[in-house]
């Protein structure tokens, strides 16, 4: 797809090597069509890695997409050059008057803290509230899914006795919802988290629809407002070696960590991973952009504030 990215974003050259079509803003300006605007609130520590993972998956629509990156004000990442943040990211205050066709809020390494003790909790809840009036459809991923469910619907999270870590089989509860168009009856998703949300809490909230779950890893996806909000507990966006990198990182730190389940060929890290989630990851993001962003967003972006449930 012609994904329109700010010139010099590292993901451009990385994905060109994978034969994925992206264009910088100069070339995109020559195409006379209304692009979709998508904003990513990137809370992950390795921001360039997450950017590349998301761009890879957003690259499968025939529509032009303008991608912006948002950051938490006053928060200085430890693993990303400050020059990169200054060039490609904006604070929420700078974007609060804008409207977006789609938004993605990533996970964050704060899941074992109570929500209210997260240093940027007040700001992120302001962003969540803003998204309801300024964004057509939002994907909340991993910790962001837990945070959004808690903020909007009072759904709690629970500590797990051991990290949910690996690639797990999932089933569809609502197979005819467009977000699952083209999905198989069962599909695989990576998970990497120390906490969970529980189906009984989702089922208590009439505004929420439980879409998919796993016998091993529990709730995977819930939907609200007819698809204006999706809460996704797994990491479909992960590249093949992300779980391996997390495993080796924790081993190197001497942390208690088991091998990611259902991941390595013959359960042997030396043999590398078996990738079983790539196809459904691409379908997930393509379907979201098509059915919940492109087909539902008004031509005049400022009319997003008039939208109800889809």
Curated annotation (Swiss-Prot):
ATP-binding found in the keyword field: no
GO cellular component, one term: cytoplasm
Site (Important for acyl-CoA specificity): 111
CDD domains hit by this protein: GATase1_HTS
Catalytically driven reaction(s): L-homoserine + acetyl-CoA = O-acetyl-L-homoserine + CoA
Active-site residues, Swiss-Prot/TrEMBL: 142 (acyl-thioester intermediate), 235 (proton acceptor), 237
Gene Ontology molecular function terms on file: homoserine O-acetyltransferase activity; homoserine O-succinyltransferase activity
Record's keyword terms, sorted: Acyltransferase, Amino-acid biosynthesis, Cytoplasm, Methionine biosynthesis, Transferase
Main location, first listed in the record: cytoplasm
InterPro entries, A to Z: Class_I_gatase-like (IPR029062), HST_MetA (IPR005697), MetA_family (IPR033752)
UniProt keyword Amino-acid biosynthesis present: yes
Biological or metabolic pathway of the protein: Amino-acid biosynthesis; L-methionine biosynthesis via de novo pathway; O-acetyl-L-homoserine from L-homoserine: step 1/1
Biological role: Transfers an acetyl group from acetyl-CoA to L-homoserine, forming acetyl-L-homoserine.
The name this protein goes by in its record: Homoserine O-acetyltransferase
Species per Swiss-Prot/TrEMBL record: Parabacteroides distasonis (strain ATCC 8503 / DSM 20701 / CIP 104284 / JCM 5825 / NCTC 11152)
């Amino acid at each position: 797809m012609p994904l329109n990215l700010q010139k010099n974003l590292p993901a451009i050259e990385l994905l060109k090597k994978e034969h994925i079509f992206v264009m910088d803003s100069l070339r995109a300006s020559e195409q006379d069509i209304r692009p979709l605007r998508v904003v990513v609130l990137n809370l992950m520590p390795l921001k360039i890695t997450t950017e590349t993972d998301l761009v890879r998956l957003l690259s499968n629509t025939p529509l032009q997409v303008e991608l912006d990156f948002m950051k938490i004000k006053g928060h200085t990442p430890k693993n990303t050059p400050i020059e990169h943040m200054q060039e490609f990211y904006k604070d929420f205050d700078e974007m609060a008057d804008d409207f977006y066709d789609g938004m993605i809020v990533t996970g964050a390494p704060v899941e074992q803290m109570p929500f209210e003790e997260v240093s940027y909790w007040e700001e992120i809840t302001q962003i969540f509230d803003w998204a309801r009036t300024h964004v057509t459809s939002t994907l909340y991923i991993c910790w962001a899914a837990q945070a959004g469910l808690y903020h909007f619907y009072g759904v709690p999270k629970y500590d797990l006795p051991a990290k949910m870590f690996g690639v797990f089989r999932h089933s569809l509860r609502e197979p005819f919802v467009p977000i699952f168009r083209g999905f198989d009856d069962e599909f695989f998703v990576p998970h990497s988290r120390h906490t969970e949300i529980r189906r009984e809490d989702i089922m208590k909230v009439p505004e929420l629809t439980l879409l998919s779950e796993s016998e091993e890893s529990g709730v995977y996806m819930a939907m609200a407002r007819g698809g204006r909000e999706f809460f996704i507990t797994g990491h479909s966006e992960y590249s093949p070696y992300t779980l391996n990198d997390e495993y080796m990182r924790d081993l190197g730190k001497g942390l208690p960590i088991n091998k990611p389940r259902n991941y390595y060929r013959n359960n042997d890290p030396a043999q590398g991973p078996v990738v079983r989630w790539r196809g459904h990851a691409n379908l997930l993001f393509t379907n979201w952009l098509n059915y919940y962003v492109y087909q539902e967003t008004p031509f005049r972006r400022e009319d997003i504030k008039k939208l109800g449930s889809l």
